[in-house]
């Protein structure tokens, strides 16, 4: 399964417009439990996702998995920002995202500003 450091995820060239991994710079880890051939791993860096995810934790992201309210998701904006949040609500016009860390603000984004959103299906905690 492709693996990328979370800090690198905002840089260009690692994802296509659908949120699928592309390009060079990806490492690999063995993870047989996910059936989505497009799933990939991100290694957490920093403390912005505490207490849910710690530095060094690995999350498995599935671009093909259906997303429901309450799911933890990776979101990439058209500005290139990549974030991990909990999906609070999605409408035809906007997406409301709840932060995992109380020190960071919740976000409401116009749907047109979201390039892609993919569900986190597993975490190494």
Where are these regions (language model features)?
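Short, positionally conserved secondary-structure boundary motifs
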Residues: 1-55, 94, 122-124
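Short coil-to-beta-strand transition motifs
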Residues: 77-84, 113-115
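Glycine- and charge-enriched low-complexity intrinsically disordered segments
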Residues: 88-125
């Amino acid at each position: 399964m492709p693996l990328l450091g979370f800090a690198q995820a905002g840089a260009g060239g690692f994802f296509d417009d659908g949120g699928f991994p592309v390009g060079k710079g990806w490492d690999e880890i063995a993870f047989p439990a996910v059936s989505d051939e497009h799933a990939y791993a991100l290694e957490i860096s920093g403390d912005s996702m505490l207490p849910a995810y710690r530095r060094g934790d690995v999350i498995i992201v599935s671009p093909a998995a259906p997303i429901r309210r309450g799911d933890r998701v990776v979101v990439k904006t058209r500005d290139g920002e990549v974030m991990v949040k909990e999906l609070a609500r999605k409408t035809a016009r906007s997406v409301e995202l709840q932060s995992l860390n109380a020190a960071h603000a919740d976000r409401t984004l116009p749907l047109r500003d979201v390039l892609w959103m993919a569900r986190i299906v597993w975490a190494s905690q």
